[in-house]
Amino acid sequence: MALSLTAINLPPPPLRDNLLSSQFQFRPNLLKFPKIPSSSSSFNGISLKTVTPNNNNNNPFACHVSTSQFGVQETNKSYAEAVAVGKHIRMSADKARRVIDTIRGRPYEETLMILELMPYRACETILKIVFSAGANASNNLGLSKSSLVISKAEVNEGRTMKRTRPRAQGRANRILKRTCHITITVKGLPAESVVEASSS
């Protein structure tokens, strides 16, 4: 028994774009945001800015940018630096860097509290250097300790003392006694400026 097959020509299915009417088609335009000029302070790289919407402009993304009073005062102030250096400290540079990286950029009083609580042997030595830097700033430059900030904290490798340890069968192992140099720089305002700012 033979079967006869007939080909049926069906129209192609309509495209998806044709199903939607022109009133429902939406092609968003690229949004252009306004450029906001910003400036940073020479002391800590942070400026306080206030952004408020601009109701007078038809652009919904337009806004007013104004620098706060603290940011303006901070830019105009002149800061002085005091340095304390500890050389040939019997400690590897890597062990000192993990503490130095924690206190860099922090206020002086907060740094003292952190060093007293951290459970590392390097904290005791670094605490003495920070105390020395604070004393140099207060006594030599007349800076207020409440305004001091750890602006720079560096650790460099020092001289390495080589020793030997006797081992079995006439051999010897090398012992490396490493040292490092620690530099702490604090930056702050004179005591007179702090008193004038607090009184005003």
From Swiss-Prot:
GO biological process: translation
Compartments it resides in: Plastid, Chloroplast
Residue pairs linked by disulfide bridges in the UniProt entry: none
Tree of life domain: Eukaryota
Main subcellular localisation: plastid
Cellular component annotations (GO), alphabetically ordered: chloroplast; large ribosomal subunit
Name the record gives this protein: Large ribosomal subunit protein uL22c
Organism of provenance: Medicago sativa
Name of encoding gene: rpl22
